[in-house]
Amino acid sequence: MWKWAGVVVMVWSSYGTAICPAWSHAKAEQEIAGLNAQISRWNDAYWQEGKSDVSDEIYDQLNTRLKQWQQCFNHEPATEDIPPANGTLRHPFAHTGVHKVSGKEELRQWMHSRRDLWVQPKVDGVAVTLVYRKGKLVQAISRGDGVKGEDWTARVQAIPSVPLNVKGVLSESVLQGEIFLRCERHIQQQMGGMNARAKVAGMMMRQNNKTVLENLGVFIWAWPDGPQSMPQRLSELTKAGFTLTAQYTRAVSTADEVEKNRKEWLTSSLPFVTDGIVVRSSIEPVGEQWLPGEGDWVVAWKYSPVSQVAEVNAIQFAIGRTGKISVVAVLESIQLDDKRVKRVNLGSVSRWQALDIAPGDQILVSLAGQGIPRVDKVVWRGNDRKKPAPPASQYHSLTCFYASPECLEQFFARLVWLSSKQILNMEGLGDSSWRLLHQTYHFEHIFSWLAVTQEQIEKTSGLNPARRLQLWHRFELARHHPFKKWIKALGIPLPQAAADALSVHSWRQLQDKDAVSWNQLPGIGTEKARKLVEFVHDSQITRLATWLGEQGIDGF
């Protein structure tokens, strides 16, 4: 593991609160150069060949990570994510871009000093300028760097939904909008981004392939020096054939109204992919004053990503109740939906080894069912990769019923299991509580807590009086659970269906059962029957059963 693994400092940058690794100068140069080279390769494929080797979401997040590292180490940026090397056409009016607010409160502050506000979906595609002269579409220019772009005229003219001829005030106009992938009933929350931006870019890069352009549409979101009234703009655009703008532009006056529309467009079917919403004021400066990065009359509020790139700070190993070793990645903290995620389970040692994850790697994390974090893939591996060795595989279902230094992890896992709702239902007793109690009373085995007196509990440091009373109450209630609950607390390897069918009511009856009688229970085969016989006759288990009998537990 790196000398500085897990050590971070915080700096404020234009990218927000950046997490800065405590790297040496040499290591920082190595890591920045490696990620920069990868992003450059993706850029070349995207802009020169019209293909994407990585999803939009991963690209955006790793590009942001690179900029954070460059900011942390005062490293001159060498990669631009929009290389307009061959873009020579100047936009009549610059593309300003949009500031992205962090949430509802920042949006509320921005809206406070502005009026005549309108909300639109943030359509996910590629930006374009359309130039109409004497009623004809004479030029289409890719966004490029916001000042100059490529000549896309012939390709845009081949998009069926783009009007080639317009009338009235649009006859001499410049429009800015988004070329998007046309969709049928796209529900953003369910279907995600579909890598739409990269797909559109790929289609626009291809030469002499007009067929694919039929799958594209355009959403107009700006009309520099157009009518001052938004309703008039929308009316004129609709009459010209740009119907989507009026359909998806709504007047708003509060952040609550914006939030309502944001939720609606996230969960309802739309004809395009989106990645958030845009709020704009119809009160704009004259077009000649538009500059890249200075569009303060418009902001975006993006959707929370369904997955996030996170840096692995450390790899830890956990020994479970049955002795199985699981691997956990400790992460740089990320936000997924309403959850703050700092750890993710990688599964068994063999799965971790197959995933090949080490501290310093960047992994894509999402939420599975019931909001449980999961690893989707490794998106970037660091240069200096050192993986810790897993603990020796010496634990199994019959180890660590008794406390010892080498057994503590499995020992505490057994305590957490027996106090869980489905076993003895000792609410509020988790890993940290059991560790505190063991530190105080030096438990010999997993049932030693039964010998702790009320007087001792009332003097336990680290617990307030109400918590002490609750703890004693839970201990007392546990004593009255039926025999079957207690054998589950012991850890007997008995499936639920077999436990339900089990007709014995004492430990003696359990020990009298042979493999043949065990095999008659549902879900019990030859191997499980053998393990059950082994379990109930194990010397440690026998001693624990005897001890439970001495404590007056039913059936023992």
Swiss-Prot record:
SUPFAM superfamilies: DNA ligase/mRNA capping enzyme, catalytic domain, Nucleic acid-binding proteins, RuvA domain 2-like. It holds the Pfam family DNA_ligase_aden. Transmembrane segments: none annotated. The active site is at residue 122. It comes from the Bacteria. Its EC number is 6.5.1.2. PROSITE patterns: DNA_LIGASE_N1 (PS01055), DNA_LIGASE_N2 (PS01056). InterPro entries: DNA_ligase (IPR001679), DNA_ligase_AS (IPR018239), DNA_ligase_B (IPR020923), DNA_ligase_CS (IPR033136), DNAligase_adenylation (IPR013839), DNAligase_N (IPR013840), NA-bd_OB-fold (IPR012340), NAD_dep_DNA_ligaseB (IPR050326). Coiled coil: none annotated. Signal peptide: none annotated. One of its GO terms (molecular function) is DNA ligase (NAD+) activity. The keyword NAD applies. It catalyses: NAD(+) + (deoxyribonucleotide)n-3'-hydroxyl + 5'-phospho-(deoxyribonucleotide)m = (deoxyribonucleotide)n+m + AMP + beta-nicotinamide D-nucleotide. The keyword DNA repair applies. Keywords: DNA damage, DNA repair, DNA replication, Ligase, NAD. Catalyzes the formation of phosphodiester linkages between 5'-phosphoryl and 3'-hydroxyl groups in double-stranded DNA using NAD as a coenzyme and as the energy source for the reaction. Belongs to the NAD-dependent DNA ligase family. LigB subfamily. This is DNA ligase B. It comes from Enterobacter sp. (strain 638). The gene is ligB.
